[in-house]
Amino acid sequence: MADDTLTHKIIGYAYKVHKAFGTGFLEKIYENALRIELEKAGICVRQQQPIKVCYDGQVIGDYFADLCVGEDLIIEIKAVQALVKEHEAQLVNYLTATGVNNALLINFGPSVQVKRKFREYRPKGSLMNAILSPGP
């Protein structure tokens, strides 16, 4: 499990970013600002982390996680009126594809919404593998 203290810090930085920008900006603006806050805090973060999804030894698709903190936490950023189940499903897919167990879904809508997802189960012998490519 990702460190709860770290998770609380990240959520605090999300509120700081939302306070600075309010609502209405593109997702990328909030993503960039949150990355800057995490870097200023000395937190190891990678932006737009490629995730290659493999099946039977072949790459069958790519995802890009907005932010990855260390090897333990994926952060997906949204800037929508309200989160919907499809946003949560996207995050669960990232967890399934990578084998990472913890993720945050942060929405910079009219108010900050945060959903924390845990995935502690990965089927043994699963045919799906993911390669977290090193960032640039």
Label each residue range with its predicted role.
Residues V59-I60, E86:
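Short secondary-structure boundary/capping elements
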Residues M1-C44, V112-P136:
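Solvent-exposed, charged helical/coil patches
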Residues Q49, Y63, P110:
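Short beta-strand or tight-loop elements
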Residues K78-A130, G135:
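Nucleic-acid nuclease catalytic cores
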Residues G22, V45, A65-L83, Y94:
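Conserved catalytic cores of phosphodiester-cleaving nucleases, focusing on short active-site segments
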Residues E39-G57:
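A short acidic/basic microdomain associated with nuclease active sites
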